[in-house]
């Protein structure tokens, strides 16, 4: 009876806490402020926790099925107990400003706690979301959904909105954890943690805070936690180490698709036919046998000899063939290329196998020029329309700062002058890079998966718990263990930077996305925590040793000190598993494929498509969006959209996304080639004339306040520093705020005494 009575005891402990974060604009900083004390009760047999503040009692965690309890110890600072059948120890300890909850495995492989319920939630999914528990669209979206915590949550917390206050759980251990949703009758979710056998850390836990029921308070408490941990590093501090960071201020983000030596516009097609003799065509055919599109190119080389014109599709096929062959180390044939200049002879004399990639491309261009002669311009002018000429046009249009990304570094080797010109114009110029997947069979169009050390595929790839190798992106190849990658990172970066290409920025896929893996390979067993540290180490190496402004995918905040910008927080990859978007090419929602003719933007990035109503509600609708990430990291990490979902990608949402970019201080992201620039320049520049000067000022300050101003949540206000405000009206009606009319579908920017209105386009 005595033991049973112990199990039924409700332990109540007084906890003096900081429970709120009130907005205070003094000195442009978010200030925390003490509120009232709270008490908590816990029932060990069900692990049910209650919190009481100002006479209002709320359940902080739903009860588990009753279980056997042992070793209950109550002290002045807290309470501990064990679940002997679960092989788990539990500790709740009183701290100055929170309740520390720690769960330690003494043998269990996994445990699920807490399960939380509330009228609504504020979750750092991407930038941040407000999720009503009874919302049907969110219920549909979360039905049977399980999210990997480290990957899906941009920051290490979740908040439950109760009737009078919010409960904020800050997660101590972000690894090996999932969040599993239930939706009947309303949304709730459970945090689950696995204790891998290869990991000696057998604990997970939380800090539980009580704070005001608004995003500014929630983000403020978390920001204090980040400061306490020494994890906050501002852009200004990053710029002290590399002044180029400041080039991100007011900078839109562009991916330029100029990955071609020659374009159709470079060629005089009538003259070309006279230069293509049988020997040269035969040589080209040999090179194109291994190309995916080689058969089509070969056919069109032959067909145009019979015609007095060249159709556009034939031009594309022939240009594709040239561009493929120009990348080959076997392109030179001394019997075929006999009329070469002195520079070409000099390059040949160095030994083709010893040439850098940039030198190889220079040689091959010169060889082709010696055959095509006046059918093409001087090699310095090849591809200018989509590279150097485009940069000139962007600068002339008024783009002062810009981040420019290339699909991979070979585009720089094709035209090194383009990289230097971007530098000279004050732009940041970067290449996309990745150390995630590794392929056994090499594909030059996926060169990030090619590594000089060929032993890595067998000796440095990740093994799952069941002994199988973990597949790479798109189920191709394998995943490279990041703890074994740094020598290859150094080799690749040394090679790229030795090619006389003046990159000043770098974009690394995956590393800031929270995609961590345990590796059960006996030769190189690795935990998720070690995986994360290795990813941070290679980003830090590129940042510090190569002096590049580093960005990465998503930008989850474990990487906030390593990166200056990220792509994916604002609009993540939308529903990867939806076949209508990814596989069904007849669907109006099909986003397009990855392939494109050389030098053109792939449909995946340029094709404008609508999204399903459910996804619009979840991913785009401003009524459910919160700037949680910006309230913590606005002047620390610059975040934009995932490159699959650039600013112009979603049909019918272009204007809404512009307004949100202003409200949340987000750089627009565009995919650009000559055709796209000519078509969209007016739209882009009308927007950037407002956005760029605003961002340049706002990004150097904290977001100090955020408010929802209308009942439908379609009018919202954000404040940066002391006196820079944005009021965005996403609705179809004018809205009056403090005697000022904010027009429908507009953003009102108030900078001290200066006011400016941006009207969103009807797109």
Where are these regions (language model features)?
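Positively charged n-region of N-terminal signal peptides that target proteins for export
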Residues: 1-5
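Bacterial N-terminal signal peptides
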Residues: 9-17
């Amino acid at each position: 009876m005595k033991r049973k009575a112990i199990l039924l005891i409700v332990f109540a402990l007084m906890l003096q806490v900081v429970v709120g974060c009130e907005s205070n604009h003094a000195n442009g900083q978010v200030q925390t402020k003490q509120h009232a004390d709270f008490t908590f009760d816990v029932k060990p047999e069900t692990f049910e926790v209650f919190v009481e503040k100002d006479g209002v009692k709320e359940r902080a965690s739903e009860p588990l099925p009753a279980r056997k309890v042992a070793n209950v110890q109550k002290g002045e600072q807290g309470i501990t107990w064990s679940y002997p059948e679960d092989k788990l120890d539990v500790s709740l300890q009183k701290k100055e400003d929170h309740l520390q909850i720690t769960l330690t495995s003494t043998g269990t492989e996994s445990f699920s706690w807490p399960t939380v319920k509330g009228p609504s939630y504020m979750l750092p999914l991407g930038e941040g979301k407000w999720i009503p528990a009874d919302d049907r669209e969110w219920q549909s979206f979360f039905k049977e959904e399980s999210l990997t915590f480290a990957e899906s949550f941009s920051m290490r917390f979740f908040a439950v909105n109760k009737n009078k206050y919010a409960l904020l759980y800050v997660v101590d251990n972000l690894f090996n954890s999932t969040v599993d949703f239930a939706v009947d009758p309303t949304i709730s979710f459970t945090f689950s943690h696995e204790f891998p056998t290869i990991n000696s850390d057998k604990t997970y836990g939380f800090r539980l805070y009580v704070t005001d029921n608004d995003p500014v308070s929630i983000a403020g408490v978390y920001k204090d936690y980040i400061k306490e941990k020494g994890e906050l590093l501002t852009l200004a501090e990053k710029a002290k180490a590399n002044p180029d960071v400041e080039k991100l201020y007011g900078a839109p983000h562009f991916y330029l698709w100029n990955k071609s030596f020659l374009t159709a516009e470079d060629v005089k097609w009538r003259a070309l036919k006279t230069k293509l003799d049988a020997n040269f065509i035969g040589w080209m055919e040999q090179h194109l046998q291994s190309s995916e599109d080689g058969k089509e190119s070969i056919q069109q080389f032959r067909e145009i000899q019979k015609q007095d014109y060249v159709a556009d599709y034939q031009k594309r096929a022939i240009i594709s063939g040239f561009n493929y062959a120009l990348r080959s180390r076997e392109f030179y044939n001394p019997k075929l290329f006999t009329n070469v200049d002195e520079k070409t002879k000099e390059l040949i004399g160095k030994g083709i196998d010893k040439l850098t990639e940039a030198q190889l491309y220079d040689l091959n261009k010169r060889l082709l020029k010696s055959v095509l002669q006046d059918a093409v311009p001087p090699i310095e002018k090849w591809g200018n329309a989509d590279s150097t000429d485009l940069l000139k046009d962007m600068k002339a249009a008024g783009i002062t700062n810009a981040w420019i990304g290339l699909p991979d570094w070979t585009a720089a080797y094709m035209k090194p002058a383009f990289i230097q010109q971007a530098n000279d114009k004050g732009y940041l110029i970067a290449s996309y890079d990745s150390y995630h997947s590794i392929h056994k069979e090499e594909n030059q169009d996926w060169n990030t998966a090619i590594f000089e050390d060929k032993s890595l595929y067998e000796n440095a790839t990740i093994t799952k718990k069941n002994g199988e190798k973990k597949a790479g992106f798109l189920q191709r190849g394998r995943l490279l263990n990041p703890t074994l990658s740094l020598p290859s990172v150094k080799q690749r970066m040394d090679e790229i930077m030795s090619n006389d290409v003046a990159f000043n920025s770098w974009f690394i896929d995956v590393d800031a996305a929270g995609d961590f893996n345990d590796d059960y390979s006996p030769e190189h067993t690795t935990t998720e925590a070690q995986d994360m540290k290795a990813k941070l180490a290679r980003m830090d190496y590129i940042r510090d040793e190569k002096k590049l402004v580093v960005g990465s995918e998503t930008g989850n905040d474990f990487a906030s000190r390593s990166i200056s910008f990220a792509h994916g927080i604002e609009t993540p990859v939308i529903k990867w598993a939806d076949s209508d978007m990814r596989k069904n090419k007849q669907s109006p929602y099909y986003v397009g494929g990855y392939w494109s003719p050389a030098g053109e933007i792939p449909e995946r990035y340029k094709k404008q498509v609508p999204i399903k109503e459910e996804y619009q509600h979840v991913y785009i609708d401003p009524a459910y969006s919160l700037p949680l990430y910006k309230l913590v990291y606005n002047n620390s990490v610059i975040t934009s959209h995932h490159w699959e979902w650039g600013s112009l990608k979603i049909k019918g949402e272009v204007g809404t996304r512009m307004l949100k970019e202003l409200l949340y201080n987000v750089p627009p992201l565009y995919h650009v080639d000559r055709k796209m620039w000519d078509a969209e320049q007016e739209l882009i520049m009308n927007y950037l004339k407002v956005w760029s000067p605003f961002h340049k000022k706002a990004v150097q300050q904290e977001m100090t306040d955020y408010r929802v101003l209308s009942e439908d949540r379609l009018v919202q206000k954000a404040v940066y520093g002391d006196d820079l405000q944005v009021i965005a009206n996403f609705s179809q009606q004018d809205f009056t705020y403090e005697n000022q009319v904010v027009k429908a579908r507009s953003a009102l920017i108030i900078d001290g005494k200066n006011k400016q209105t941006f009207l969103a386009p009807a797109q």
